[in-house]
Each structure stands twice: as C-alpha cells, then as structure tokens.
A protein has these predicted regions:
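Mg2+-dependent phosphoryl-transfer enzymes with acidic/Ser/Thr/Gly-rich catalytic loops
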Residues: 2-6, 22-23, 35, 203, ...
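Conserved acidic, metal-coordinating active-site core of Asp-based
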Residues: 117, 121-124, 128-248
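Short, structured coil segments at secondary-structure junctions
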Residues: 57-60, 67-68, 205-206, 260-261, ...
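Active-site residues of response regulator receiver
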Residues: 10
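Short, acidic loop-to-helix structural element flanking the phosphoryl-transfer center
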Residues: 20-36, 104-111, 167-170, 194, ...
Length: 300
C-alpha cells in the first residue's frame, strides 16, 4: 500500500469506544503518526460545536471534517480552545478561532424543500448551521436518550444556549431567516422502524445526499457533500494526492469517505456492507484498539 500522509477517522464506533473514550493505545498511535508527519483528523457528522473535548485534545489534531463533510475546519494549535472560543460568550472569547477552510451549504430553495419534507414526520429535528446545532423546544422535548448522549459529549456542563447548541422558539421561523446558512439536517425518529419507513421519501429527493448515522436517524446534506469529498478537498489543499489518503470507519455514513479515499479501513464492528468496501478490516473493534491496529498495519 502507498505511504499514508493524511488519515480521516470516523468517531462513533471507530475512534470512540462504546463508552465514548479513546483507548490509550489508539491515543499513542495517533501521537506517533503525527510525530512522523501524518495529518490525523476526525471526520464526523456532528457540528463543530459538538466536537467532543477528548477528540479536540488528541495529540496533534489540527483539522476537522464536520457536518458529514459540509465544513472543514483548521483548528490551529489549540483545537479545544479554538472551538470553545468560537462558541463562548463575548466576555470569555479568546483571540484564536477556528478557520473554515471549506463550507458547502444547501441552495436556499433546496434547504426549504428538505425542511418541508422533515416537517411531515414526527421526530427530533436538528439543523446544522455555522458549526452549531439548532433545534426548537418541541424537538428538544422529543429528544431521546441517544441524542442526549451525543450532546453530553460536547462539554461537561452547559446551558441550553451556551453556543454549542442553540434552542429556538420555532425552527420554521428561524429557517425563514437562515435558509442560506444550512450545512445539514438531521432527524432522530422514535425508533429504527419509523426511520426506515420514512427513508424512501428522502431518497426520492433530488440534489441531496441522504445517509443514516444510526438506524433511527436520517441526515441530509447538499448534493456532493460527504465526508469523502471533504477529505479529498483538504488533501488537495495540503498537496496530498488521493492515493496517500486513508479513511477509517464502520457505518453507512462513512461509505463515501471509504469509497473515495486511497486506502479504506473498516473496524471489526463495522456493518457487513461497509466491510465489503475495505482494503483492510481490523481484527479488533472500537473497544479494543481497532484504530491503533490500522495504524500499526499501515506503518503509520
């Protein structure tokens, strides 16, 4: 296999264990790869504001792909400080803020069309904009344990409008003023069956990308927006050819990244159809140093 110069890591089920931790061996493997000059970055469906602190604090992490590829960020030399700076109150804001290198938003009319379709279903709808998660009070009330777990990773203590996610009175009213700023839509349904029943309606939309981060959700970005295209855009910006890019993932929302990267690695806990895309499938899962195994196998 070619020398790897940039490695994009999915979070849930890949970099993060089921207990939402990074194993010591994986942390060390990342530090060693960075010391050798490899660019290692998270590639997530989350908004920048909800990037877990333990990920932002990984050794040498400077860049992040967020919102399923709708944005690519340069977090500078203090990633955690940069994220907190951008989404903190003005009184506590630092001078260093993350720079958005790539941002690919919905065309206004397409954003309105997608939002209109989501309104036909009951669930917890979040709108991703400018690195934040926007939802209204009804969506917040519908939010189940899965979504609460995801939000809990953004910070240990927070208030509803601390900047990392923003609760508005009415999402439709907010959309009337911000339809030109949308990175991604994401709805969590009551269960996987409800999401599966709704999927055909979303697949019928033109000019969008539809993925599932989990069986009970549906996520939509603009056409051509995915983790894979974001990885290649960053690699091109850094002068790294596609052949020297690595993607590591486990689920359907990693498909485009795995298909487009020069080398694709899938975790032992990955979905069978995703393992079929891999150049390398680990013997270890996300709880047992799977990412470290990838790095060791590829000599990173």
């Amino acid at each position: 296999m070619p020398e790897i110069r940039i490695a994009a890591l999915d979070l849930d089920g890949t970099l993060l264990s089921r207990e939402n931790t990074v194993t010591p061996a994986t942390r060390q493997a990342i530090a060693d790869a960075v010391a050798r000059g490899v660019v290692v970055l998270p590639a997530t469906g989350r908004a920048l504001a909800n990037l877990p602190p333990l990920v932002a604090q990984l050794p040498g992490v400077r860049y992040a792909i967020t919102s399923n590829g709708a944005a690519v960020w340069d977090l500078g030399t203090d990633p955690l400080g940069a994220v907190y700076s951008r989404y903190s109150d003005a009184e506590t804001r630092q001078t260093s803020e993350p720079a958005c290198l790539v941002r690919r938003l919905f065309p206004v009319e397409k954003a309105r069309e997608v939002f209109g379709l989501y309104q036909e279903f009951e669930g917890s709808l979040s709108v991703f904009s400018d690195g934040r998660v926007i939802r209204d009070h009804l969506a917040q009330e519908r939010m189940g344990n899965h979504q609460r777990r995801l939000l809990s990773l953004s910070t240990e203590a927070k208030q509803p409008n601390d900047g990392r996610f923003h609760i508005v009175r009415d999402t439709a009213e907010w959309m009337s003023r911000h339809a030109h700023e949308i990175e991604k839509f994401c709805m969590f349904f009551e269960n996987a069956e409800a999401a599966e029943a709704a999927l055909p309606r979303f697949y019928a939309l033109e000019g969008v990308e539809v993925v599932q981060g989990s069986p009970d959700n549906i996520e939509v970005t603009a056409k051509g927006v995915d983790k894979g295209s974001a990885l290649l855009a960053l690699a091109d910006r850094l002068g790294i050819p596609r052949a020297q890019t690595l993607a590591v993932g486990d689920s359907e929302n990693d498909r485009a990244m795995l298909e487009k990267a020069g080398v694709a690695a899938v975790m032992a806990n990955g979905m069978p159809q995703i393992k079929a895309l891999a150049d390398l499938v680990t013997t270890a899962d996300c709880d047992h140093d799977g990412v470290a195994e990838v790095f060791e196998t590829l000599g990173l």
